[in-house]
Every structure is written in structure tokens, then in C-alpha cells.
Curated annotation (Swiss-Prot):
Gene3D superfamilies for this protein: Ribosomal protein L9, C-terminal domain, Ribosomal protein L9, N-terminal domain
GO annotation, biological process: translation
Keyword Ribonucleoprotein: yes
Protein origin, superkingdom: Bacteria
Cellular component annotations (GO), alphabetically ordered: ribonucleoprotein complex; ribosome
Membership in a protein family: Belongs to the bacterial ribosomal protein bL9 family.
Biological classification of the source: Bacteria, Pseudomonadati, Pseudomonadota, Gammaproteobacteria, Pasteurellales
Organism in which the protein naturally occurs: Actinobacillus pleuropneumoniae serotype 5b (strain L20)
Alphabetical list of InterPro entries matching this protein: Ribosomal_bL9 (IPR000244), Ribosomal_bL9/RNase_H1_N (IPR009027), Ribosomal_bL9_bac/chp (IPR020594), Ribosomal_bL9_C (IPR020069), Ribosomal_bL9_C_sf (IPR036791), Ribosomal_bL9_N (IPR020070), Ribosomal_bL9_N_sf (IPR036935)
Function according to Swiss-Prot or TrEMBL: Binds to the 23S rRNA.
Keywords: Ribonucleoprotein, Ribosomal protein, RNA-binding, rRNA-binding
NCBIfam families to which the protein is assigned, alphabetical: L9
Protein name (database record): Large ribosomal subunit protein bL9
Amino acid sequence: MQVILLDKVAHLGSVGDQVTVKSGFARNFLIPQGKAVMATAANIAHFEARRAELEAKAAEALAAAQARAAKIAEIAVVSVSATAGDDGRLFGSISAKDIADALTAAGVAVAKSEVRLGEGPLRTTGEHEVKVHLHPEVNAAVTVNVVAE
């Protein structure tokens, strides 16, 4: 199925690219999320008329993500407290939601879906490096200091 991308999609293309994808991927993911439209003659003409607007919107989203990444770089370290045993292991864990809440409290709005925990939830006290995926082209890193209560 031929589609026109309205947004940058990882491993597929950027705004305005006309790509061939499997019909299920287009119908179940790209089109419902507003990332693509079917490549009909009418949609191609409509897209060409709106190309400048969509590219400006994509550039604005990239600039906003870069500004948020700069704020996260300024913060550098975020502390999260949790109950822990004597050996430094937590009773429970620190999830992406907890880290997103801590970053939001520090002044940068971050959704839990943007926090990338490579090895799963944090289960020990100490400092942990966590990646924040703000945009397909913008990633930031923050150090999470887990402190025992």
C-alpha cells in the first residue's frame, strides 16, 4: 500500500515521503495515528498544497524537543526516594512513570513513554543513567539518583 508520510517515522522516512508499507501497518498504525495518508491522486495534490505547513510543523516540533533536551541537560541529576533494605535493594522498583514525575517536578514536562529504561525498572539505590527519547532525532540523558528513605 502506498502512503504519504505526514510525520517523520523511524526506519521509514520523513515528511512528504511516498513509501510502500504493508496494508495492516498502514491501516492499524500509520493512518489512525495521523502519521500518514493513503497516496491517492487527491491526497497527493492536497499534500503538495500543505507541504510547507507540515514541514514547518515538523521543524517546530524538533526545535521544541531540542529545547527540552537542553533543559534536561541543565538539570543533569534527579533524585528519587524509595524504601530500601540494608543491602541497597529497593522494596519495589523505580519505573519510567516515577522518573517522568521527578523530571516534571524539576521543571521539564516528560511523558512516561519518553523515558527509556534499557534494563527494566531500577531496583537498587545509587546513580543510574537513563535515556529520554524526546523526538526521533533528539535524545537526552539524565542521571537518576535513587535514595533510600
